[in-house]
Amino acid sequence: EIKNVTYFTEIGLTLIVIALFFKVSAAPFHIWTPDVYEGSPTISVLFFATLPKFASLIFLFRFFIEMDISSYSSLLFIFKFVCVLSLLIGAYGAMTQTVIKRLLAFSSINHIGFILLSILSFQFLSQGIFFFYLIIYLVTSFGVFSILLTLRNNLGEIKLITDLTGLKTHNKSKAIALLVLFFSLAGIPPFAGFFAKFFILTASMNEGLIYLSLIAVLSSVIAAFYYLRIIKTMFFNEGEDTLQENSMFYHNVTYILSALFVTFFAFYPDPIIFIINNYFS
């Protein structure tokens, strides 16, 4: 009878975890994400790519720890499997995209893989580091989508990566801000995203998740390619500048603060780590 209770408990926990994976767009439960990102207005994407995901990931983190998911071998395997798929599908899926919001959708799936890796490394990872990665990712995403909200072309919202051609000359401050934000998303030092990934990889290596750590490093290398492709389009591609401004004051404030935040961390990391460790640990 005890075995039956444990069996049904494990089934119930598995269904809850799968529902959460679907909610946060973890692979292979991500199929809806690229189409929704592409088809929705940018302001809507900005919302559901940040705030609901933040709440769902916190719940998933607490659920993993409080329910002691690591003691269930099948559930632990599912977590690792989904982590690997998210890292690889997110990285490889973004490489072939020409629509910028679809690319960002696959990018978000890749970052979910890193967040799942942080959850799997919880024994060697303080809650502060989990929240640090989550906050860095969400702030950076908020900044990127805020810039996209302010840019249009003759047909309306910009859709293709090539629509960003000439941004360097059209609005240098937005081009530089996107450069900083994409460098952070790619995990390129000295920006905040690099330290966030470094802390998680260190914890996962200490946990003994060597193969997951190597896959995460590989996915970061691949991710750097498609972020750099966008940067190349903004700064080096030649073509007609069809960009138009649709700036609101709060959009400009948001992207400037986001870029300053990930840059500030490169030079003064201690205050931010102290705050996160004290308020989220």
Labelled PLM ranges:
Residues 1-281:
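Alpha-helical transmembrane segments of multi-pass membrane proteins predominantly involved
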